[in-house]
Amino acid sequence: MKAFNTLLLLSALPATVITAQTASFDDVKDRELPANWTNTKTGKGEPKWTVEKDDTAQSKPNVLKQSGEATYPLCLKNDTSLEDGFVEVKFKSVSGDTDQAAGVIWRCQDADNYYVCRANALEDNVVLYKTEKGKRSSLDIVGRRGGYGVEVKVAPQTWHTLRVEFSGSRFKVLLNGKHLFDAEDATFAGAGRVGLWTKADSVVMFDDFSHGTN
């Protein structure tokens, strides 16, 4: 009877629902922007986000490509509002003289207020920032004072997977499945949009953009 009562108690507990969505961009017409996405920027310039066919696409045939130039080009997914969960994308740095950076955005309030984690193929590092009122600042790594992200090889012309898991003020950063570091910040505590990010003249391809709760 005791075991039976335990089963009844467990069955009455609310189930943890894990939801995730993935955008592969394969149902979008060539040279167009996906529906429910916004092409915007932090700062000045002219970002250019388009879906294009590419033989190296991780889920063929299409990728989402940023080929314009701006301070920080953004592509935000409008139909999202995520407080705790994850965001993940596959990316390939194609070119860029000033920068070759690819990032994911979460808890985005608008084009001037959000969190972003980016990998850089010119600097060979991964850094997590907050952008507040249009000003970007890097966050300290948990357990370390100062410094600038983590040095790690980010080969150009190669597909990588960048993922950030976030719960409350804690953020966990992974590159190609390897846990690089954690960071903490409580500037943006509520839900916000998710999206993609580049910098300056970075030409980057993105594929299999995923987000959800966990």
Which residue stretches match the model-derived regions?
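Short, solvent-exposed beta-strand-to-loop segments that form ligand-recognition rims
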Residues: L174-R193
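Extracellular carbohydrate-recognition regions
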Residues: A20-K41, D207
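Ligand-recognition surfaces built from glycine- and aromatic
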Residues: S24, F188-N214
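Positively charged n-region of N-terminal signal peptides that target proteins for export
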Residues: M1-T6
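Short, aromatic/His-centered strand-loop micro-motif at the edge of beta-sheets
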Residues: K135-R163
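Secretory/extracellular carbohydrate-interaction modules
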Residues: Q66-R136
